[in-house]
């Protein structure tokens, strides 16, 4: 489009005239009669009467309300639900031949589209390769497989919203896109939930069933919950290729897990050993670090734990005396928060440079319970300034003590059993007792023997099993471990070299720290649900203990038998093999997901075409537990990084800042926000879950506080837009339902805008090709420039992975540029006869391009509205907006390849908008609700006057004023006009004579001034909690408002003085 001089935009309908389209006499029909006339007097008296009646009714109502308890006001009102009721078979295209309903209704908009998208194959890479805009590039990504432990929550919805936005954008660009759906079997989590369900419904414990019967119950539960999760993904609009769906326990995944285990074992990267592991006594299984919740305790805290008959106090430091052998009266006092592990102590340690104990180096101490000799050892890891500077050493139940024990050759004593009771090594008096019951008995014994030296509150961090709520113990167990040092070094170097990009980049520090301190990974779990370990114990081989047992690994029992024969030198027929009953850590199979989902270990076409993945997007909390392990195993097993880019988003937390967790009961089902839900139903869902009574009470109370009136229906598009609108790459995301509701109102605004546009275009409108669209006015040029700017910003946001930039840009364009400005300004033009051809073409371009820009974020609403637009002349319209070309700034051009973007024009109009805001403020000050006063602008800068000149008519329309003209520089201010200076160069005059009643307005302004002055005085005379900058800003704002009121009062006083006396008339 040629960049014409601004003065050239002077078509008839946009020239300098008193009003849009038709000349208007000075006495406008919307103006009141002159002050003092009989009509004006009667109107004023009637108005005053109505105000008195209204005030009396209000006072009566307040008096009545004071007699009854106050009821909180609802924060939202129910919207009318419109349903799509045209018979449409699943997979058929929705009927859009009828008119749009009068208001936006999510249920109407979201009906039928998803099934049609899936049936048409729009989500398949094979379809996208045939698109006209096909780039030949590949974009592949996998969904972080959600656990089949229930329904998805808002944290999952955030992941889906972000991933689907990128997937849809790449698809519309023309890339060949594959987004792989899947779900995770979630070993411990699923087994724990099913065990609770079995007990609640059948009063049956897992060990009362056979392994086969229990697994049958889990598979049945999975079929129910797995389907629910996929329904949620569809409701969220996730454009996944469902033909490639996988589950981490299906046949293909099982084959991949077995192959990975065998290969790692053959390479010496997987071994069996007896080491300390995180142990859940309730689950009777080792658990992963991510399932250990570190709960800080400020001091004494009483907890009730599963399986423990008494409440237990934590956050207490117990001081215990260890007598020095052979030196009566000499003792070393040791502080501990774990007196129940005292029977497992094998030494006491002090720092070698601590002068308090130098004379006791090498001495023996007496165990306070058994009287056995314990060595006093010195170790530099002991902190002499903490407590007494002496610590007890329990290598079998503390990771730090285990390392110290290894350094000093100490033999560990396991005194806590798998079920959390005390072992036989503790003696008959403690054996079989629950460990925390034993704690109390040990304390009593210490008091009786005179070796108890005190009890004090002590801040501490308590490890809690997130799956059971029990305190995590550290137990010595024979388990399978993956050697991680070598693989971890490669993963660290991949980020350091730039081969693997982490975004935001600040996560690199956590990544490098984790791999620098990585230990071997315990991958075995004492469960029934999961991938059974493909390892076999060879029977008949002599072994002193489990550490000397003979184990072999194989893809099948036959392969394992052959390996056992080779290892033992015995014939296969004589061998007895017993398969390890344990299963693998869920994270092991999850770490294989990027390539097992594509068919690995088979050389499939999908693996060749889409691996490595283009991008991994997930929550920042999974950086090490999932992302790090995928990188380690992917690089080791495939020879390639599983992906080259990782995008980590913030965490969604509840009102108390806690992570969303099903065990806490603080999760929100996205469908409840999409469709709305009553409080009673929300509470019923909690009761139907697997929470114990304590958790249920806490969750129900929090839910009632957060949603006293339930949750309003917001729709999928509003939820997705709200989730993506946050700066997802920084701190935690605290999402409120009221925020989502605000974006539902934004959807309604879009809906009304398209209804207006479609009516304005009419049935016979034929849109021109985009390159033939040329503006016929400055306003046309401005909105097209804003549209091109929006396209540029959206592209920049997607490329820079800042979806909040995309949402902000689209919200601003649709609401503030198109709806608030252009549509209002163009209404008089569209209603004129004949209507110029330019504005309808511009309107169509705004709708077409604007909806395509919006489609990755609001797919349902964009599809519903875009399908109703007529196809462009001479072009083949895409069957769906989700495969239509995504606009970019450089693609929005007119004839001659001139860009729609005109920054200079936008700068000019920004000045016009400032004038509009000043005029609206003036109208509000003088309460000119219906009158359309004339306006004069006086500028000392001729250049600035030339910039504003082309926009005089839309300026009047947007400010709700009448004719707008210019007052020559230096000319005297007109009498009876209000003044609003705008900077140093422009003065704005607005007509007041005959439009306002000074006698009624002056008291109102005086009351308003008195109120603001009181606020200012209070602010100046009191100390506030706000910072100095906020306080000064508030003071300046009040002072400016007071100045404006004084100026308005002065103008009104001048009007009264200049007005003729009624007695002279």
Swiss-Prot record:
It catalyses: tRNA(Val) + L-valine + ATP = L-valyl-tRNA(Val) + AMP + diphosphate. It is an enzyme of class 6 (ligase). ATP binds at residue 662. GO terms for molecular function: aminoacyl-tRNA deacylase activity; ATP binding; valine-tRNA ligase activity. Catalyzes the attachment of valine to tRNA(Val) in a two-step reaction: valine is first activated by ATP to form Val-AMP and then transferred to the acceptor end of tRNA(Val). It holds the Pfam family Anticodon_1. A motif ('KMSKS' region) lies at residues 659-663. It comes from the Eukaryota. It is found in: Mitochondrion. Residues 42-52 have a biased composition (Basic and acidic residues). InterPro entries: aa-tRNA-synth_I_CS, aa-tRNA-synth_Ia, Anticodon_Ia_Val, M/V/L/I-tRNA-synth_anticd-bd, Rossmann-like_a/b/a_fold, tRNAsynth_Ia_anticodon-bd, Val/Leu/Ile-tRNA-synth_edit, Valyl-tRNA_ligase. Residues 27-52 are annotated as: Disordered. Keywords: Aminoacyl-tRNA synthetase, ATP-binding, Ligase, Mitochondrion, Nucleotide-binding, Protein biosynthesis, Transit peptide. GO terms for biological process: valyl-tRNA aminoacylation. Its EC number is 6.1.1.9. A motif ('HIGH' region) lies at residues 146-156. Residues 1-15 form a transit peptide. One of its GO terms (cellular component) is cytosol. This is Valine--tRNA ligase, mitochondrial. Belongs to the class-I aminoacyl-tRNA synthetase family. The keyword Transferase does not apply.
């Amino acid at each position: 489009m040629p960049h014409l001089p601004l003065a050239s935009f002077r078509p008839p309908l946009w020239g300098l005239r008193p009003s849009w389209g038709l000349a208007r006499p000075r006495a406008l029909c919307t103006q009141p009669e002159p002050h003092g006339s009989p009509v004006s007097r009667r109107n004023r008296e009637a108005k005053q009467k109505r105000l008195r009646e209204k005030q009396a009714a209000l006072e009566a109502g307040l008096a009545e309300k004071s007699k009854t308890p106050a009821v909180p006001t609802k924060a939202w009102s129910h919207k009318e639900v419109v349903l799509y009721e045209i018979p449409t078979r699943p997979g058929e295209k929705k009927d859009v031949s009828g008119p749009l309903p009068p208001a936006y209704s999510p249920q109407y908009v979201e009906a039928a589209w998803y099934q049609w998208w899936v049936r048409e194959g729009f989500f398949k890479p094979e379809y996208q390769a045939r698109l006209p805009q096909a780039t030949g590039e590949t974009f592949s990504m996998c969904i972080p497989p959600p656990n089949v432990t229930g329904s998805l929550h808002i944290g999952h919805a955030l992941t889906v919203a972000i991933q689907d936005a990128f997937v849809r954008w790449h698809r519309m660009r023309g890339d060949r896109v594959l987004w792989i759906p899947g779900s995770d079997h979630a070993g411990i989590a699923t087994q724990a939930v099913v065990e609770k369900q079995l007990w609640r419904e059948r009063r049956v414990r897992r060990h009362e069933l056979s392994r086969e019967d229990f697994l049958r119950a889990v598979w049945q539960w999975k079929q129910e919950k797995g389907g629910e999760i996929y329904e949620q993904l569809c409701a969220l609009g996730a454009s996944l290729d469902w033909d490639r769906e996988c589950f981490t326990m299906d046949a293909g995944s099982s084959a991949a897990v077995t192959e990975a285990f065998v290969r790692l074992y053959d390479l010496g990267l997987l071994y069996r050993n007896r080491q300390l592991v995180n142990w859940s006594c309730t689950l009777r299984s080792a658990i992963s670090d991510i399932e250990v919740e570190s709960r800080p305790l400020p001091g004494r805290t009483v907890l009730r734990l599963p399986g423990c008959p008494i409440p237990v106090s934590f956050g207490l430091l117990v001081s215990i005396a260890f007598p020095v052998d052979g030196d009566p009266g000499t003792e070393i006092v040791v502080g501990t928060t774990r007196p129940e592990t005292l029977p497992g102590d094998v030494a006491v340690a002090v720092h070698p440079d601590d002068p308090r104990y130098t004379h006791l180096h090498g001495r023996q101490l007496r165990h306070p319970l058994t009287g056995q000799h314990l060595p006093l050892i010195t170790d530099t890891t002991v902190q002499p300034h903490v407590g007494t500077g002496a610590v007890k050493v329990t290598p079998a139940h503390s990771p730090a003590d285990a390392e110290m024990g290894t350094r000093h050759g100490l033999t560990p004593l396991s005194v806590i059993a798998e079920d959390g009771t005390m072992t036989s090594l503790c003696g008959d008096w403690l054996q079989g007792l629950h460990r925390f019951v034993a704690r109390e008995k040990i304390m009593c014994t210490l008091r009786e023997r005179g070796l108890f030296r005190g009890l004090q509150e002590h801040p501490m961090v308590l490890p809690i099993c997130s799956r059971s709520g029990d305190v995590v113990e550290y137990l010595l167990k024979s388990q399978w471990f993956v050697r991680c040092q070598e693989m971890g070094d490669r993963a660290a170097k991949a980020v350091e070299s730039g081969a693997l990009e982490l975004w935001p980049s600040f996560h690199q520090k956590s990544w490098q720290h984790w791999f620098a301190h990585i230990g071997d990974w315990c991958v075995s779990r004492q469960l029934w649900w999961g991938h059974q370990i493909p390892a076999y114990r060879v029977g008949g081989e002599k072994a002193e203990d489990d550490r000397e047992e003979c184990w072999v690994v194989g893809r099948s029992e036959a392969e394992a038998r052959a390996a056992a024969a080779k290892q033992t030198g015995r014939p296969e027929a004589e061998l007895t093999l017993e398969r390890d009953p344990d299963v693998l850590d869920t994270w092991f199979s999850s770490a294989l997901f990027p390539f097992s989902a594509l068919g690995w270990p088979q050389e499939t076409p999908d693996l060749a075409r889409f691996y490595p993945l283009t991008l991994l997007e997930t929550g920042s909390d999974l950086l090490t537990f999932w992302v790090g392990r995928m990188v380690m195993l992917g690089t080791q097993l495939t020879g390639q990084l599983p992906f080259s880019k990782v995008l980590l988003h913030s965490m969604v937390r509840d009102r108390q800042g806690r992570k969303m967790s099903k065990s806490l009961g603080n999760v929100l089902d996205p469908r409840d926000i999409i469709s709305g839900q009553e409080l009673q139903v929300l509470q019923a869902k909690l009761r139907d879950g697997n929470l114990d009574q304590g958790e249920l009470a806490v969750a129900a109370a929090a839910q009632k506080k957060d949603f006293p009136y339930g949750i309003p229906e917001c729709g999928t598009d509003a939820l997705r837009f709200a989730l993506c609108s946050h700066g997802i790459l920084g701190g935690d995301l605290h999402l409120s339902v009221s925020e989502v509701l605000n974006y539902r109102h934004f959807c309604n605004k879009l809906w009304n805008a398209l209804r207006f546009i479609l009516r304005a275009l009419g049935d016979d409108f034929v849109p021109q090709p985009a390159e033939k669209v040329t503006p016929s006015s400055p306003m046309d040029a401005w909105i097209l420039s804003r549209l091109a700017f929006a396209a540029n910003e959206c592209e920049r946001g997607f490329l820079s992975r800042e979806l909040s930039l995309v949402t902000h840009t689209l919200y601003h364009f649709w609401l503030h540029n198109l709806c608030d400005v252009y549509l209002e300004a163009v209404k008089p033009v569209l209603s004129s006869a004949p209507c110029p051809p330019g504005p309808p073409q511009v309107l169509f371009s705004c709708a077409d391009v604007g909806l395509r820009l919006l489609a990755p974020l609001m797919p349902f609403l964009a599809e519903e509205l875009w399908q109703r637009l007529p196809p462009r002349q001479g072009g083949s319209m895409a069957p769906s907006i989700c495969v239509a070309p995504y606009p970019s700034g450089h693609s929005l051009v007119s004839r001659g390849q001139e860009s729609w973007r005109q920054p200079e024009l936008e700068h000019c109009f920004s000045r016009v908008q400032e004038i509009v805001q000043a005029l609206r403020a003036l109208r509000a000050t003088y309460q000119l609700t219906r009158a359309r006063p004339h306006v004069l602008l006086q500028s000392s800068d001729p250049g600035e006057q030339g910039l504003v000149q082309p926009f005089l008519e839309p300026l009047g329309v947007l400010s709700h004023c009448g004719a707008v003209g210019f007052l020559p520089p230096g000319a005297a201010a007109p009498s009876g006009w209000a003044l609003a200076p705008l900077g140093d160069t422009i003065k704005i005059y607005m007509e007041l004579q005959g439009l306002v009643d000074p006698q009624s307005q002056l008291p109102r302004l005086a009351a308003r001034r008195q109120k603001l002055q009181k606020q200012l005085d209070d602010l100046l005379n009191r100390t506030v909690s706000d910072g100095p900058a906020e306080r000064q800003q508030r003071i300046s704002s009040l002072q400016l408002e007071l100045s404006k009121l004084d100026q308005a009062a002065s103008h009104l006083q001048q009007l009264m003085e200049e007005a003729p006396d009624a007695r002279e008339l």
